[in-house]
Amino acid sequence: MIELLERQKKLTANQWKLICTANLADLLDFFDLFLIGYVTAALTKQWSLTYLQGGLILLASGIGAPPGAFFWGWLGDHIGRRTAFILSAITIALATGVMYFTPGPDGLIPGWLFLVIFRVFVGLGNAGIYTIDLPLVQEFIPAYKRGWVSALVTTLLPAGSMLAGLASWQLLPLIGWRGLFLIGLVPLVLVFMIRYWVPESPRWLMRMGRLEEARKSLAWALMVDPKEIDLPTTLPTVEKTRWIELFKYPKLCLAGMLTGLTQTGGFAIGVWGPTLLVLVLGTSPEYAAFLMIFVNVSAVVGRFFITALIEPLGRRWSATLCLVLGGILMVVQGYYYNVFIGLSLIHI
């Protein structure tokens, strides 16, 4: 039954709808993830935060992400990709919205500690978005398209940070940092979109023995009548393995380490960048947000560029080119750390 996906010549409108929904999910949830960098930049002077307090606020989501990835991956295998996706979107949106009620620096629970606690939950929820939406999309897509589609789904991650920068630049003087946290509730819209637009993964349904539901899900993806799809006469065999067996594959371990290194660099720039601009260069929080917009625009352009190269060059060479260019630019950036080009800092 699933082999019908592999015979596709081009993606259907429903498959594109799924890809767009996943992109929107990444954009909105990474808005919530990176918003804290701009809020911390504003609070650094307002609350006279120490380096330790500011650092803990920015680090907190990273504490919640690793266990979150394991948890949501496990949950997605047990209750379904779609349901886990919805729950992760709810988690990150509510955790961000609750920070509207952050007490002041002298409250019973100091404001910085309140932010640390709920940022852990933001990281926990965000790990689910990244862990679940890729398998969900891939299981609706033919194998020969998965590399390209996976790259496309993550293309708008920096756009979430860019939107956070735009919102902070324009709205911070009007609604304050608490108002920015309320905007973080917007990902709840995703819950309704996913609930009504996206069915459960046909591969997961087949693995659970729910063949009729799997047929309807596959028919939705292919945009055909479910009656045109024949049910398999036998259930697919599922081999149970322990997660630790993944470490038997050296290439998988190497890919995981490289992913961790690249994610660390990207996360550091997005979250720590605005605060460092305020602390080191003395910019205003609003101007720091404005400058970060250009960083994130270049990140979006770069992701589209690499995505376009995947089919002609292949996945390995595209990834190699990306890593080499990133390494060269990091060296150049470090060498010219005190040189500014483009926009003048006169308007700080």
Predicted feature descriptions by range:
Residues 1-31:
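Cytosolic juxtamembrane N-terminal segment immediately preceding the first transmembrane helix
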Residues 70-80, 303-314:
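Helix-to-loop junctions at the C-terminal end of transmembrane segments
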Residues 90-108, 325-337:
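C-terminal ends and interior cores of transmembrane alpha-helices
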Residues 346-348:
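Conserved small/polar residues in nucleotide/adenosyl-binding loops
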Residues 36-37, 249-300:
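Extracytoplasmic gate region of multi-pass secondary transporters
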Residues 1-8, 195-251:
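Intracellular cytosolic loops and amphipathic helices of Major Facilitator Superfamily
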Residues 145-173, 187-188:
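Glycine-rich segments within core transmembrane alpha-helices of 12-TM secondary carriers
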